Amino acid sequence: ANNTVSIAQAQFEPKAWFRGIYADETPVGFIMLFDDPDEPVYFLWRLLVGAEFQGMGYGRQAIAHLVDYVKSRPNATELKVSHVPELPGNPGPFYQKLGFEYTGEDDDGELVMRLKL
């Protein structure tokens, strides 16, 4: 989903935690988490970085900040994300470089990855 759809979804989901990603004053992306402090597993719902800003470290920095945030939450033991491997720009290798591992789960065609905290 694009930024507009993601922001609209976040407005109607009380457990959505979302932030813009900026380079100084320039918006370069968007990150959204399903934030349920009653659960030990948190889910990275969206990470969107504009094509012209990819490969510049913004996504990596956003994930690092997100991991710090999740570690501060009660009961947090892992952060999960899923992706469709057949789509262009498959983010699997990006997440693997950040320490995420495949779980073997398939969530409706999306491969699930996890980062133990």
Regions found by a protein language model. Name each.
Residues 1-45, 50-52, 69, 73, ...:
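Acetyl-CoA-dependent GNAT
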Residues 66, 70, 98:
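Conserved alpha-helical elements of the SDR catalytic core
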Residues 114-117:
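Short beta-strand-to-coil "C-cap" segments at the C-terminal boundary of structured domains/repeats
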Residues 95-105:
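Conserved acetyl-CoA-binding loop of GNAT-fold acetyltransferases
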